[in-house]
Amino acid sequence: MLLAYYVPSTGIPEVSFDIGESYAGQIPVDWKKTGSKDPKFFYWFFPTVNPAGKDDVVIWFNGGPGCSSLEGLTQENGPFSWKYGTYKPVPNAWSWHKLANVIWVEYPIGTGFSTGHVTAKNNTETAAQFVEWWKNLVDTFGLQGKKLYITGESYAGVYVPYVGAAMLDKKDKKYFNVKGALYYDPVMPYADKLRLDHAAFPGFFRHWESVFAIPDKNKKILDNDNEKCGLDKYREAHLTYPPPPAPWKPVQVKGCDITAHFDEISTVINPCFNVYHVQDTCPVLWDVLGFPSVQYTPPGATLFFNIPGVRKAIHAPAAPKEWASCSGPVFVGDDDRYDPAEHEKKFQTLVEKTNNVMIGSGMADYIITSNTTALAVQGLKWNGKQGFQTAPSAEFVVPIINNTESNVENWAGGSVQGSVHSERGFTLATVKTSGHMVPQYAPPAAFRQLEHMLGRVKSLTDAEPFSVNISTSFKWPY
């Protein structure tokens, strides 16, 4: 059966190098139901050749809901990298499969090449569907008893706790031996009506003010919004250590919609403003995946996963005819029926049963700002207490990388990359130079965080060398 999923390591269109052993295709949720309307998840699996990672399996989800994890594989943490604005794919020195077996899954059903009739009404049902499917994948590749680590970004802030809790609730280490989780710039467990994003915005704006280049008259509007609704005062009152007891009153936004006023002027000043990475400016760069912030496909261009030879190599289905980075609906009625209280319980289960959960937050992300995440954390309860009890103060340190002329395509920054703080089995880290997709914008930072979750390095606060050589070789030793 494995041969049916085997992906040739060479000869993938546009990829001019050996990507190593991998397997891809669809596996049904139920082997007895394999018709065109029956649910099947699409995955791409890269086994590791690192002896230290043979018993570790990392699952990666992108967000949305309905955004493809093939985006994560191709532009963030997979073996080959084709980031927007670049000429062609290159080997990714920061590929996560250098540390563990990694499986990128298009989740939920209705995303990308994961096809079938959408029946899930909420995240509990999508997680249950995934858990059922996961057993089939484990049996297909003989992954019984492996240690599982669930990772992702954005709306995967919902996926990861729901899937993790559903697996842990099974109490079956043969198939669901969950040992930790790592996810980035996530949707956090709080009600939208709290409007924590508004309370976090003034500080975010001040941090990036020189980048935004907003005219003085517009800055006065933002200042008035802040003053009228007490946004800084709310943040100062709630982003404390320890925090005030939850539940909290919502942020006042009536008559002072600060983010709407910012949105009105930001794209006038910078028409190419990228909500996922605020340092971006014009021109809009061609993205072979047609994403993220400003979708632009030059005439005659084809998205990478719509190239016939690529689809053939990875055993993609004939439908959908046009793959897209984000698709859907993935819930019945296109409504996830989000329940923040339930989400918090899933988060608690994941943390309390693994004591190995980390959230990373890119400080150049406007969609979910770092202080929005920090505020949300202070409103959550886990392992007997609410929020962090002491203020984050430690520096998040990444070993300095040897950037040379021979590895320009993988140049990346090291040294102090942000902050990190841990209490009661949960860690929050910020990454100064990253936007929404930390493995894309700051790959060494994400690589380091994965090393730490897997137990390969002891600390995120010193420059202990990486556990593997950083090179573009996928053969052991690297």
Segments (PLM) and residue ranges:
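Alpha/beta-hydrolase fold nucleophile elbow
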Residues: 141-155
